[in-house]
């Protein structure tokens, strides 16, 4: 039984993402379900202070979680997030073309499905999508520590939020320069979370820009090249941009900008909370004291153990279900 629980507890986020997707498709008041779920999550996490015991381990020290199952779930989140964006773009298109707001079907004889969407419910759909697209970034983060196929999935997942640069910046900058002035993802004391949002995003992008500039120069290759991973990362976002522009023109672009803004804010808010104000003398070893940890049950299960930052930075190659 404990082995089953060690695996299914991490299905909390995927389950709520699917509920949010269903809400955007159904329309009406259900378009706001992602916003409602966020509110419920904050309340539950505030009240439920019980500490999570990670995935628990067998007597031989191995984790009870199944690597195959957990990896499959992470890989499957990419098409789910693509569907979430498609559903929102479809809602934008219906709004822009004046599709009448009528009940055209019911699910399970109880849940109405609307053909069109009102401006108020479209706002709900945009906010809900942005909130749970941010959860996609969590899976992109986990897979960025892998190689090969998993890393490609990570880049594509982050590309859906216009942040494919993160995969390289996180591994080659944040994990090496943690809590120092050279790490844009570490917020120094006195910086607001809103200021950190922009400075961290742009700083990480600048790191990959410079990294590729130096790498390609050593290779004798032009910066404007298909071999430029900084450029390729942003090109991954082109299909998403094209989708929303075709769906609603500049309104579609505003919708996408809002979704990207929310999802990336969630990422940088996590960076802010995990390392705010911590200082490490450059070239000194990274220690557990250079991270703020949180292992309450809801945070651990919903954010797939991202709160176990100390162990994550100590053993960066370790999968989330193995962290202590």
Regions found by a protein language model. Give the residues of each.
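Alpha-helical bilayer-embedded segments of polytopic membrane proteins, i.e.
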Residues: 2-49, 65-91, 104-132, 226-268
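Intramembrane catalytic core of multi-pass membrane enzymes that act on lipidic substrates
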Residues: 62-201
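Membrane-helix interface linkers and caps
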Residues: 48-62, 99-100
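Generic signal for short, ordered secondary-structure residues
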Residues: 58, 122, 152-153, 249, ...
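Cytosolic/stromal cytosol-facing helical appendages immediately following the last transmembrane segment
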Residues: 2-16, 20, 148-228, 262-324
């Amino acid at each position: 039984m404990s082995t089953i629980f060690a695996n299914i507890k991490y299905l909390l986020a995927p389950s709520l993402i699917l509920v949010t997707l269903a809400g955007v498709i159904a329309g009406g008041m259900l378009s706001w379900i992602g916003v409602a779920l966020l509110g419920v999550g904050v309340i539950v996490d505030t009240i439920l202070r019980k500490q999570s015991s990670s995935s628990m381990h067998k007597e031989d020290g191995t984790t009870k979680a199944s690597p195959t199952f957990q990896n499959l779930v992470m890989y499957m989140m990419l098409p789910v997030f693509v569907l979430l964006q498609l559903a929102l773009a479809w809602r934008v298109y219906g709004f822009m073309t004046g599709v009448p707001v009528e009940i055209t079907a019911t699910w399970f004889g109880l849940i109405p499905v609307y053909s069109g969407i009102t401006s108020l419910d479209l706002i709900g759909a945009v906010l809900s999508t942005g909130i749970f697209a941010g959860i996609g970034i969590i899976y992109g983060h986990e897979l960025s520590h892998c190689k090969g196929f998993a890393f490609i999935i990570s880049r594509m997942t982050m590309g859906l939020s216009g942040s494919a640069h993160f995969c390289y910046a996180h591994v080659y900058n944040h994990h090496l320069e943690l809590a120092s002035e050279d790490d844009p993802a570490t917020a120094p004391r006195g910086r607001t979370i809103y200021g950190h949002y922009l400075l961290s995003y742009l700083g990480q992008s600048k790191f990959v820009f410079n990294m590729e500039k130096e790498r390609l120069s050593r290779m004798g290759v032009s910066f404007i090249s298909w071999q430029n991973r900084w450029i390729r990362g942003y090109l991954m976002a082109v299909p998403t941009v094209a989708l929303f522009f075709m769906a609603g023109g500049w309104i579609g672009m505003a919708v996408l900008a809002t979704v990207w803004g929310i999802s990336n804010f969630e990422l940088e808010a996590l960076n802010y909370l995990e390392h705010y104000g911590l200082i490490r003398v450059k070239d000194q070893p990274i220690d557990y004291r250079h991270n703020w940890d949180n292992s309450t049950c809801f945070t651990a299960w919903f954010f797939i153990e991202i709160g176990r930052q100390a162990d994550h930075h100590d053993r960066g190659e370790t999968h989330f279900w193995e962290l202590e």
